[in-house]
Swiss-Prot record:
Keywords for this protein: Coiled coil, Repeat, Synapse, Synaptosome
Protein family per UniProt: Belongs to the SNAP-25 family.
Keyword Coiled coil in record: yes
Name used for this protein in its record: Synaptosomal-associated protein 25
Entry comment describing in which tissues the protein is expressed: Exclusively found in brain and ganglia.
UniProt-recorded Gene Ontology molecular function terms: SNAP receptor activity; SNARE binding; syntaxin binding
Gene, per the UniProt record: Snap25
Length: 212
């Protein structure tokens, strides 16, 4: 049975240049929206990583504090032991003859001066407020083409990304400052450890002389 001519598919009307531009604009809007979503997700991941790093640095700082307190306690104990050794040496007459006088430990005052890891230092990075953030917020982050819900979401996403980037920058400054403080503290701990080691060696030598 021959097909009804009225049911034949009408030939496709070619799109006008305006329609082509509108289709392209819709595609660009979809791609841009997905890009802002990915940016927001990456910022969230970076924020979580930054928080974990700050927590780890805080835990590490507490461990360093305990180590340094231990060094200070060893130093205090050794001072007390040296007083006792001096008293025993006097009782045993070791110090009567200059040739028999034992060598006392000479302490470097700079090693045991007050801890400065918690003080503000001149090279501590300062947080700088960027006025461009406010200017961007007033003018908008994107150039609107379709003026639909997608562009509203893009604008909101970009605002959140801008805020997160500012927070990440501040977190990075905090990390850098904390690392500088901890590096100085590690240097102090090393100096105190070397001082305690030398002090113990001298005390052992004095004790051996008492036992002769």
């Amino acid at each position: 049975m021959p097909a009804d001519p009225s049911e034949e598919v009408a030939p496709q009307v070619p799109k006008t240049e305006l329609e082509e531009l509108q289709i392209n604009a819709q595609g660009v809007a979809d791609e841009s929206l997905e890009s802002t979503r990915r940016m927001l997700a990456l910022c969230e991941e970076s924020k979580e990583a930054g928080i974990r790093t700050l927590v780890a640095l805080d835990d590490q700082g507490e461990q360093l504090d305990r180590i340094e307190e231990g060094m200070d306690q060893i130093n205090a104990d050794m001072r007390e032991a040296e007083k006792n050794l001096s008293g025993m040496e006097k009782c045993c007459g070791i110090c009567v003859l200059p040739c028999n006088k034992s060598q006392s430990f000479k302490e470097d005052d700079g090693t045991w001066k007050g801890n400065d890891d918690g003080k503000v230092v001149n090279n501590q990075p300062q947080r700088v407020m960027d006025d461009r953030n406010g200017m961007m917020a007033q003018a908008g982050y994107i150039g609107r083409i379709t003026n639909d819900a997608r562009e509203d979401e893009m604008e909101e996403n970009m605002g959140q990304v801008n805020t997160m980037i500012g927070n990440l920058r501040n977190m990075a400054l905090d990390m850098g400052s904390e690392l500088e403080n901890q590096n100085r503290q590690i240097d102090r701990i090393n100096r105190k450890g070397e001082s305690n080691e030398a002090r113990i060696a001298v005390a052992n030598q004095r004790a051996h002389q008492l036992l002769k």
